[in-house]
Amino acid sequence: QTAAQRGVKLAVFPEFCLTGYTCGDLFLQRTLQQGALDALEWLLAQTRTLDTVALVGLPLLVHGKLYNCAAVLCRGQLLGIVPKTYLPNYGEFYEKRQFTPGSTEVQTVTVCGQQVPFGTSLLFRCRQMPSFVLGVELCEDLWSALPPSTFHALAGATVIANLSASDETVGKAE
């Protein structure tokens, strides 16, 4: 609400901001997954009258597979869900243990009672600002040889949002 009051049109929150990044195997627990959906539903209700596009990170179970996702929402509506493509599995990162990589194939899924597109190749266009075309990727996606953002830009994206988070380990900054 504060962002909308200040005229912010796009608010990008961190990867897994609805649960925290360091949940590890707790991501596999139905209670945590439902808690993330409950938080998303609450956000949808709180943003019904707001003219800000918000991107929030959450784990999402789709057809029996768990994904690390960005939910794109505005005015109480889910505009789409973008799953992470490249899952890190080195050092302190073990995402392949819990998550499935996203696909460019777009499918329709039901989230919080809304039918929404789900896929890594989604672009979000603003009717009031035709030159504003949003592409979304998550953290490690950016560091791949061919990041989703490259394909988003080639498809017409003028803004790329990257939801990122990381855990903290002793000596990481060294």
Region locations from a protein language model:
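Enzyme catalytic cores with a strong preference for nitrogen-chemistry domains
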Residues: Q1-E174
